């Protein structure tokens, strides 16, 4: 007997393809046929190399078998989870949220570390442009002028700055977690859309799915960049742009290996 496929129009199954096929033993036995249903799993964007079982893997064709729980449903899934951090669905959902949020902060932070130095090197009077030195200006006699302009924000108390940061960032994070704030409600806490997408970049589902991947790829790079900026600040005492300029001027003596050897015992 030929297997049959049908779509149920009941509201409970609306939009889901259901495969109804008899088991072989049932056909060959008494001739009685029992129908089995198989609900198709949701797939990623059609033709996208970043989603689904055939997506790009972390080592390309040498990646091996991916864990069963990494199905390529979510952006940034390259099938790599050696430590099993994503095995638990709740932990996986939480880690996805943390990664996206930290990626966005890292991208903003990396821009904030680099941009003032670029402006200062191109003749813009910026006060202290190096990111880790700028904040310490608040301990000077004159305090800290935002953007080097005393008419904007003239900060003189580190406690006042700390309290302001806690209040403002606490409010923003509270709105994000609750999914409700001055800009309205959000159905998706990670990708709220609406007022947060004034250019309508997420209107097309295919383009939106690809933008999610691009955001995570750039965010992961930004997190590594911020870590590198921290290490540079400790080791060289200079900002990222100045370190880059020194390396380009003398790559032999200004590189990670040369600075690492300075910490060899007895040197």
Curated annotation (Swiss-Prot):
Bilayer-spanning residue ranges: 100-120, 152-172, 221-241
UniProt binding sites for chlorophyll a 1: 80, 86, 99, 220
Annotated segments matching region Interaction with LTD: 221-224
Binding site for chlorophyll b 5: 165, 263
Cofactor note: Binds at least 14 chlorophylls (8 Chl-a and 6 Chl-b) and carotenoids such as lutein and neoxanthin.
Binding site for chlorophyll a 2: 102
Annotated binding of chlorophyll b 2, by residue: 104, 153, 183
Primary location: plastid
GO biological process: photosynthesis, light harvesting; response to fructose
Residues binding chlorophyll a 6: 247, 256
Example GO molecular function: mRNA binding
Residues involved in chlorophyll b 4 binding: 165, 176
Recorded GO CC terms: apoplast; chloroplast thylakoid membrane; nucleus; photosystem I; photosystem II; thylakoid
Post-translational modification: Photoregulated by reversible phosphorylation of its threonine residues.
Modified residues (N2-acetylarginine): 36
Ligand binding (chlorophyll a 5): 214, 232
Function, in words: The light-harvesting complex (LHC) functions as a light receptor, it captures and delivers excitation energy to photosystems with which it is closely associated.
Similarity-based family: Belongs to the light-harvesting chlorophyll a/b-binding (LHC) protein family.
Subunit structure: The LHC complex consists of chlorophyll a-b binding proteins. Interacts (via T14 domain) with LTD. Interacts with CAO/cpSRP43 during its post-translational targeting to the thylakoid.
Protein name: Chlorophyll a-b binding protein 2, chloroplastic
Source organism per UniProt: Arabidopsis thaliana
């Amino acid at each position: 007997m030929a297997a049959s496929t049908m779509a149920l129009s009941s509201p409970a199954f609306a939009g889901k393809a259901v495969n109804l096929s008899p088991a072989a033993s049932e056909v060959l036995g008494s001739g009685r046929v029992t129908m089995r249903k198989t609900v198709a799993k949701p797939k990623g964007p059609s033709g996208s190399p970043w989603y689904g079982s055939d997506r790009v893997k972390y080592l390309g064709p040498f990646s091996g078998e991916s864990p069963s729980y990494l199905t390529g449903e979510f952006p940034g899934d390259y099938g790599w989870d050696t430590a099993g951090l994503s095995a638990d669905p709740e932990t996986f959902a939480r880690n996805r949220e943390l990664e996206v949020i930290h990626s966005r902060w890292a991208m903003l932070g990396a821009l904030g570390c680099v941009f003032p130095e670029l402006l200062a090197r191109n003749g813009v009077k910026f006060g202290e442009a190096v990111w880790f030195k700028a904040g310490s200006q608040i301990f000077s006699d004159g305090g800290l002028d935002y953007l080097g302009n005393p008419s904007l924000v003239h900060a003189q108390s580190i406690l006042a700055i700390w309290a302001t940061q806690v209040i403002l960032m606490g409010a923003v994070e509270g709105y994000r977690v609750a999914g409700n704030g001055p800009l309205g409600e959000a159905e998706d806490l990670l990708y709220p859309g609406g007022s947060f997408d004034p250019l309508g970049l997420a209107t097309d589902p295919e383009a939106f799915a690809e933008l999610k991947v691009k955001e995570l790829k750039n965010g992961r790079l930004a997190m590594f960049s911020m870590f590198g900026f921290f290490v540079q600040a400790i080791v060289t005492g200079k900002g990222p742009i100045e370190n880059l300029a020194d390396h380009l001027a003398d790559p032999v003596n200004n590189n990670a290996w040369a600075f690492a050897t300075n910490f060899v015992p007895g040197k």
